[in-house]
């Protein structure tokens, strides 16, 4: 058998275009990843750059804005924001009651809250145990200084910040921790106040009188002492949390933000209409706008909150305008912070707002508490945005009404019930203005080409928990939804670009694989005809040789016949 092997061609070198395709493929992937990371870093670094500039600009100015909004990052969105409530001059109360079968007993407690006030005496928060036990924990202001008093068994334990008064109208954050009888209290970034109880002398007294106690009473006495020791470390059967001090006659007047107690965000729960929370008196959630007279009341404020025009209970209103933002149910100019500064009346007086004249529509509105709680408005470098001075008669600065609000007011007389979204009081485009920072807390006014955003504040909680994020009346939005809407336009282009680049790379890769599989390769082939001829020749070897010899001789003879001779 003869095997004829065609020469196998060695595999050709990988052509240069294949290397080019691979390099293009990896280049697309690297560029896509780099562009996405670059966009993410730029979007995350922009707020930081604003805050750095604001600290630099405002290094020599110490102004505080009582009402602030913390716009949380992505990782903190979705239910983590706090709420801010304003307590008026007539006093108010937010009361949270634990269910009867879910009353906790704690060995350690953590309380934190942000506040701003000018009163010298008042109760901010008080936690009481079930009736008959007598355990309590109370955060209060006494003679302008913040302090905590608690009783978990026998005597009242007090801890107080003695250095500096806190009724200066500025925003402060107070943190209190308790572990047994030990306690700490800190205001802002000031030094921590600590309290450690003295040693228990019951055992020493027991040793002294033990000889006089009958033997059969020794065991009950020891058990009684052990029970007393347990009561000195455990806050038993907590029943309710009272905010505002109205139930005790020590009214708090000012604002409270982001209250946190042992995992409960009570102000958040109040803003969400928790069934275990009741609100009484002059209490208003920041972001709610009082209804115009003639319309139905859209807020949960009781009628006894009504006061006179001069007894305004609002703080500085940061009215902002957001353009080019719209959702299915939110107006483009929503997501603003308004504290009843659109009218010269109190936030509890639902009287009709009359439009004013002049240039007051270009300024921020401020109002103060009569007899105490005063809003500190920021100083503006630009004259166009300098707030109007507070008038001596009404002590309230008002803004002019937009045409939309005038139409709302006119429609109210005809029976219509409009809903006034927060921030509808000023719809003019605002020019960029200098950044503002609240000290000692890092705050900021975010700037844009056509809008002014509210400042940032740090959380009064222990681990950077955000505070006030007001919502619009009638619309309950998840905190952080505005940022998601604002970022969607920038991320959509990035996602489309990444998908297109990936699809192009995949097509190029498939084409390269197709060309590589269909290339020409060397092959082996067996010549069967030669195989049969050789088999027939092997049967008679001599015949084959004779045929070869005869063929050679015949060929020679033929050659000889063809020869020609010339003479």
Curated annotation (Swiss-Prot):
Residue intervals annotated with topology Extracellular: 36-492
Sequence segments annotated as region (Disordered): 41-64, 317-341, 535-567
Cell membrane as UniProt keyword: yes
Signal peptide interval: 1-35
Glycosylation sites: 182, 280, 340
Regions that span the bilayer: 493-513
Chief place of localization: membrane
Molecular function (Gene Ontology), one example: calcium channel regulator activity
List of residues binding Ca(2+): 135, 152, 234, 236
Gene Ontology, cellular component aspect: cell projection; GABA-ergic synapse; glutamatergic synapse; presynaptic active zone membrane; presynaptic membrane; protein-containing complex; trans-synaptic protein complex
Domain of life of the organism encoding this protein: Eukaryota
Post-translational modification: Processed by alpha-secretase leading to the formation of an extracellular soluble protein as well as a C-terminal membrane-embedded fragment (CTF). Proteolysis of these CTFs by gamma-secretase releases intracellular domains (ICDs) and extracellular peptides. O-glycosylated; contains heparan sulfate. Heparan sulfate attachment is required for synapse development by mediating interactions with neuroligins.
Domain annotation Laminin G-like: ranges: 83-283
Protein keywords: Angiogenesis, Calcium, Cell adhesion, Cell membrane, Cell projection, Glycoprotein, Heparan sulfate, Membrane, Metal-binding, Proteoglycan, Repeat, Signal, Synapse, Transmembrane, Transmembrane helix
Cytoplasmic topological domain: 514-567
Example GO BP: neurotransmitter secretion
Annotated PROSITE patterns: LAM_G_DOMAIN
InterPro entries found in the cross-reference section: ConA-like_dom_sf, Laminin_G, Neurexin-like, Neurexin-related_CASP, Syndecan/Neurexin_dom
A Pfam entry, by short name: Laminin_G_2
Membrane topology listed for this record: Single-pass type I membrane protein
Presence of keyword Chaperone: no
Family of the protein in this entry: Belongs to the neurexin family.
Summary of subunit composition and partner proteins: Weakly interacts with CBLN1 and CBLN2. Very weak binding, if any, to CBLN4. Specific isoforms bind neuroligins NLGN1, NLGN2 and NLGN3. Interacts with CLSTN3.
Protein's recorded name: Neurexin-3-beta
Lineage: Eukaryota, Metazoa, Chordata, Craniata, Vertebrata
């Amino acid at each position: 058998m003869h095997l004829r092997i065609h020469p196998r061609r060695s595999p050709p070198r990988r052509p240069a275009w294949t290397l080019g395709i691979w390099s293009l493929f990896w280049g697309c992937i690297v560029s896509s990843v780099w562009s996405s990371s670059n966009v993410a870093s730029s979007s995350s670094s922009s707020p930081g750059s604003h805050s750095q500039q604001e600290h630099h600009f405002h290094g020599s100015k110490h102004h505080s804005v009582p009402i602030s909004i913390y716009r949380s990052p992505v990782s903190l969105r979705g239910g983590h924001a706090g709420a801010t409530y304003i307590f008026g001059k007539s006093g108010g109360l937010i009361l949270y009651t634990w269910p009867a079968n879910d009353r906790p007993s704690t060995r350690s407690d953590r309380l934190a809250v942000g506040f701003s006030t000018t009163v010298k005496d008042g109760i901010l928060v008080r936690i009481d145990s079930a009736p008959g036990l007598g355990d309590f924990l109370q955060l209060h202001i006494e003679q302008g200084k913040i302090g905590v008093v608690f009783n978990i068994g026998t005597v009242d334990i007090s801890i107080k910040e003695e250095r500096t008064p806190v009724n200066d109208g500025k925003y402060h954050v107070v943190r209190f921790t308790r572990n047994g009888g030990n306690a700490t209290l800190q205001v802002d970034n000031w030094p921590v106040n600590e309290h450690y109880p003295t040693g228990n002398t019951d055992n020493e007294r027991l040793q002294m009188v033990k000889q006089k106690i009958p033997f059969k009473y020794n065991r009950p006495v020891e058990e009684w002492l052990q029970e007393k020791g347990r009561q000195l470390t455990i806050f038993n059967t907590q029943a309710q949390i009272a905010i505002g001090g109205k139930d005790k006659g020590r009214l708090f007047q000012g604002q409270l933000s982001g209250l946190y107690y042992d995992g409960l965000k009570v102000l958040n729960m109040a803003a969400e209409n928790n069934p275990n929370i009741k609100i009484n008196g002059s209490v208003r959630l920041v972001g709610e706008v009082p209804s115009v007279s003639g319309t139905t009341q859209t807020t949960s404020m009781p009628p006894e909150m009504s006061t006179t025009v001069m007894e305004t209970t609002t703080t500085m209103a940061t009215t902002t305008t957001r353009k080019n933002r719209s959702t299915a149910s939110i107006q483009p100019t929503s997501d603003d912070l308004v504290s009843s500064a659109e009218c010269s009346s109190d936030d509890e007086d639902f009287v009709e707002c009359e439009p004013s004249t002049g240039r007051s529509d270009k300024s921020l509105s401020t109002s103060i508490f009569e007899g105490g709680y005063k809003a500190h408005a920021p100083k503006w470098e630009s004259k166009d945005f300098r707030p109007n001075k507070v008038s001596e008669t009404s002590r309230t600065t008002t803004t002019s009404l937009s045409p939309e609000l005038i139409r709302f007011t006119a429609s109210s007389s005809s029976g219509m019930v409009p809903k006034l979204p927060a921030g509808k009081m000023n719809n003019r485009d605002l020019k960029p203005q200098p950044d503002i920072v609240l000290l000692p807390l890092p705050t900021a006014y975010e700037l844009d080409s056509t809008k002014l955003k509210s400042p940032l504040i740090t959380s009064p909680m222990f681990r950077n928990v955000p505070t006030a994020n007001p919502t619009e009346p009638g619309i309950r939005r998840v905190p952080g939804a505005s940022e998601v809407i604002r970022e969607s336009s920038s991320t959509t282009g990035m996602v489309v670009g990444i998908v297109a680049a990936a699809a192009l790379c995949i097509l190029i890769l498939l084409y390269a694989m197709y060309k590589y599989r269909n290339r020409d390769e060397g092959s082996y082939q067996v010549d069967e005809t030669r195989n049969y001829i050789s088999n027939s020749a092997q049967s008679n070897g001599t015949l084959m040789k004779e045929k070869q010899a005869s063929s050679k001789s015949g060929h020679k003879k033929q050659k000889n016949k063809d020869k020609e001779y010339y003479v």
